[in-house]
Amino acid sequence: MSDQTSIAPLAVRERFMSDPTLGAGNFLDRAVEANPHRAVPFAFSHRLDHRGQVVLRGHSLLDLVALRDRYAAWYHANGVRPGEPVGVVIAEGLEPLLHFFALTALGAVPALVNDAMRHDVMVRYLSHVGVVGVVADDTTRLASAYRKDPQLRPRFLSLTAEVQAFDAASAALPEGYPYQHAAEDVVALIHSSGTTGTPKSTMLAHRQFWEGKQPRMVRFPAESYDRLMSLMPHTHAGGLSYFMTTTLLGLPTVVMSDWRRVAVEPVMEAFRPTMVASFPRTFVELATGELPTAGAAMVHSWFNTGDSAHYGHIRRLVQLGERPAGLIRPWLLPQERAEQAALPGSQFVDGLGSSEMGMALFGQVTSPETERDDRCVGTPSEVVERAAVLDEDGVEVPDGTVGLLAVAAPSITPGYWNNERLTQSFRQAGYWLTGDVAYRDAEGRFYHLDRTVDVIDTLDGPVYSLPLEEVLLADCAAQVQDCSVVGVPHPDGGQRPIAVVRLQDGASADGLLEAANAELAKAGLAELAALRVADRAEEFPLGPTGKVLKRELRTRHAGLLSAAAPARP
């Protein structure tokens, strides 16, 4: 990596904060216009050479623009026009971001699809979106799926390699390129994780997706030594959000194409990040077994976005790395002047957000000095206009009462593509319902207990799965590497909670149910009716973004308690 900085001067970053035309559709152009270090590499891809050594390749802002323009010429030559949705089914890494840039520069709407999605689900999703074309790393299975129903086939179904090999000199870009977006223009479609069924298609708008991120221009660590490893799926709003931030900052960033520890740790050792951004899936692996001491030696901050991570994993990660003197407080927290001295260990910034929220709208920071506070996601960020806990009728409930988490903020999605009815179902009393169950304490801190679809309906009342998982992961850590708690039918009526666990290497499940229930009783939580060990990957199913598919666990174990129960007289 170059010794010359790629980071935009503070004055440039401050101007971004007040630019009324800046948004998700033109942030690359704004960055290349304003950053005097536009020729210095900042975005890094990675690969292994023939000796198994990590090779990092840097791309400057100018490099990204050149690649974008070449890809845009291919799309334009293939008939893509403003407002048309195009499917992008490309493996994680920098490549899907280049296609995002190319399509938005034409005013088209990239429908970014995680290539791990099942192909039958993918075809249903792309057909619902109404894409005019699809670019994919491998079109074989998609083509086969479309042959079963030719009416669904889009105008083109092309290989990524075809776009990469295109001779851009043979095609012209359209007049008025790059496209000038209006604030409300849709610039991307992001699918949900599919944990509840067919993925929803969340719209990201030009200005909406930038709202709330302005404070990052001055409150995201961007010292000369700072480097970010981005493990977010870059076909997801989280990955796009972080890359928008680092592009505008000019912050050196390695865009990972693989989230597994076996791939991540060697790149950490080569890149030496000071920050790591990920969904919980990678944090679980990094916190398991021997810690990645060498790769995380310089890490001062871990950023999690999505469903909040678990304390049992967080407490191990924050023992790694070091915090430099004056480390700024993240944008998710109330603004305060940083005065702390250099400290050992790191901070874990746990943000509760979603594609629909546009970013993490709640934030909690855990460091080695922080006391345990299970399921706390902190207070709303400054972009949030209102945050509340509502009952089913949309009435705000008192502090300490569990209800539906609701937010009002300019970062909230315009809605779901081609599904106004679904969009309206998430709007209530001027709020957006996040799909989460939570409560607020008297100090204004929010506690995230479950997704609404995962609440366990017992005869004694609702049981929330996430607090139970916290206990298993933190207090049964010698045996439990990861777990998921779901509700299944009980012969006496209602549901009871069961746990599906992945054991630590070499650990046994002997006595685990009894030990877990003893710890749950100490915490005042419901006990588990049963426990099952997931020995194989298919027994602990994950969605395209790495989230556990609880619906599949509920189906798999639906008869567990009925089969185990004695026959009724």
Sequence positions of predicted segments:
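Conserved AMP-binding/adenylate-forming core of the ANL superfamily
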Residues: 41-79, 84-93, 97-101, 118-123, ...
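ANL superfamily adenylate-forming
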Residues: 44-53, 57, 140-184, 193, ...
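Conserved AMP-binding A3 loop
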Residues: 57-62, 187-211
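Structural core segment of the AMP-binding/adenylate-forming
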Residues: 77-78, 105-168, 180, 297, ...
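Conserved AMP-binding/adenylation subdomain of ANL enzymes
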Residues: 210-227, 235-291
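Conserved AMP-binding/adenylate-forming
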Residues: 309, 314-443, 452-455, 468
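AMP-binding/adenylate-forming catalytic core of the ANL superfamily
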Residues: 409, 415, 437-527, 552
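AMP-binding/adenylate-forming catalytic domain of the ANL superfamily
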Residues: 521-548, 564-569
